[in-house]
Amino acid sequence: VKAADWIHCNSMSELGPNHWYTEDPVKYSAFHPNNIIVSNRQTQTSFIIDKKTKKIVWHIGPDYYSDSVWYLNGEPQKGRALGRLGQIVGQHHTHMIPDGLPGAGNIMIYDNGGYSGYGPRNPATPTGWSNSRRDYSRVIEFNPVTLEKVWEHSAATMGLREGYKFYSDYVSSAQRLPNGNTLITNGAVGQLQEVTPDNEIVWGYISPWYNPNGKFNLVYRAYRVPYDYVPQIKKPEEYAVTPPENAEWRIPASKTPYKG
């Protein structure tokens, strides 16, 4: 079989300093700060490579059933942990939350849904290529030692019945911010959102830049950086924004508010 991009690696980064390795460098040797964490979308796998030995020392996927096996320090782990975490499909931006941020040491993933994986063919995929399908996304944060999920952002956690209302089937990312909120890039729809730990959207932006045919405003990934990263621009004044009443809006060109 001839195929291109059969792994689709979309993120790779050093773990950096973390409390696991600081607490016990032998027990948690998998989390050496120099080790590299990798996300492979098409194979539905995320893993950590020991930079010295070149061996995989932590690994989840491609299956996330209650009887699926995962690996810690190169040793197989059993139990129901992967089943509780839930199937991950077509993920992006697997990374460890850096030291100094809320949730430091946990793993965060933008679990796209959409399509990925390999397996038995079915009507949706006669070749068995991308045989995993799901029409919603979620951002998950979990403990890398127990795989216990500690936070999720999705349509369901926002109280929405329609999963597609939080959905980007490719690209995308998530970044923990110093204030405990999370900056999420729903890349396929060109949307950035800052959400609180309680899943409230407190800031949003939709890219106005579309491709020539006007159908795509894709944003691959976005990060929030400190003002001093761009010293040539004067630091702006920040001010609090009061959320508007949902039942009040203004008709364009009218100064009179309409209340429903």
Kindly give the residue locations of the regions a language model identified.
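Histidine-/acidic-rich catalytic cores in large beta-rich domains
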Residues: 1-260
